[in-house]
Amino acid sequence: MDISKKTNLTMLCDYYELTMGNGYFVQGMQDCITYFDIFFRSVPDNGGFAIAAGLEQAIEYISQLHFDEADIEYLRGRKMFDEGFLDYLRNFRFTGDIWAVPEGTPIMTVRAPAIQAQLVETFLLLTLNHQSLIATKANRVTRAAKGRTVLEFGSRRAQGVDAAVDGARAAYIGGCKGTACTLTDQLYGVPAGGTMAHSWVQMFPSEYDAFKAYCETYPDNPTLLVDTYNTLKSGIPNAIRVFNEVLKPRGLTKCGIRLDSGDMTYLTKKARKMLDAAGWQSCKISCSNSLDEYIIEDILNQGAQIDLFGVGERLITAKSEAVFGGVYKLIAIEDAEGN
C-alpha cells in the first residue's frame, strides 16, 4: 500500500514533537544524533509473550515523510515556529537508522538527528502498539484452537477503517489463516473468504431454496449458515438435503455448515452426528459469534465438534486487553566523535 497516495501522514504526530523540534533547531541541536528505543512494559492478558507487528507500515510511513506547503502554512499560522525551522521542514527527509525484530516474532531502535527522531514517535507507537496488540491476541486465539483453522471476522466491529484493514493483517501475522476483509486481501495478500449472512437465507421463499441457490452458484466447497430459523430441526436437515441434491450428483464432497448462535458445544455435537449419519463426514463445521481464546478453550474442553472458528469483535478490538502499552524513550545521545 502506497501511503503517499492515500494521504500525507507526516502531520500525524503529537504537537509537542513539533514544538520540541523547533526548540532543538533554535538551540542548534538539530544535528545531534539520538537513540530511541520502543519497548513495552507488560504483555497483554498476562499471557507470557507478545508478537511484534506493524513494521511494514512503519517503514512505509518513514520512507514517505515530507512536509508540503499546506503543512508549512498551517505551522506558520500557529505563530510558534521559527522561519528557519519551517525551511528545515520544507526540505525534511528521514536520514536515520532503524533496527527492529522481524514481524511475527516475540521491537525497534531509532538512531537519527533529534528532530527526526521526535517527529516519528507518534506514528511508530500507534502503528506498532495497535498491530502488535492484535497479532498477540490472534496468536492466543489460534493456540486455543489447537490446530483448527481460525479466520479473522472483525471488520464491522473494528474501531475505524485502518483498525479493520491493518488489524486483519496483524491477525494474519499472529496466526489466523485468513480474513473476511476484502481490502486487506487486495492490499496485503491476506486470503479473504466468506459465505453468507442470515439476510441471504431471508431473501428466499424458504431456507431450502436459499441453500439450493447458494450451492448451485458456488458448488465448490460451499458453507451454509444453518441457524437462521432452527439449527437442528430445519437448518442442518435442509443443508443435508441440498448437499445430496446438488453436490452428490456432481461427485463433490467438500462442504461446510456454520453456526452463529446458540450453545456451540451441544449444537455441534448434534450436528456432527446428523452429518455423519447422512454420509457427510467430509462436511466441516464452523462457528462464530463473539468468540475469543477463553470461550474456544472452554467449548473444546467440553467436546465441541468444530473444525473452523470465525473470530470477530474480541479479536479485532483485543477486547480483554485493549492497550499494548509500547513506549518510545531516549536511551543515548552521540557525541561529536560518534561515541
For the regions a language model picked out, list residue spans one by one.
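Ordered alpha/beta subdomains of enzyme catalytic regions
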Residues: 1-220, 246-248, 329-339
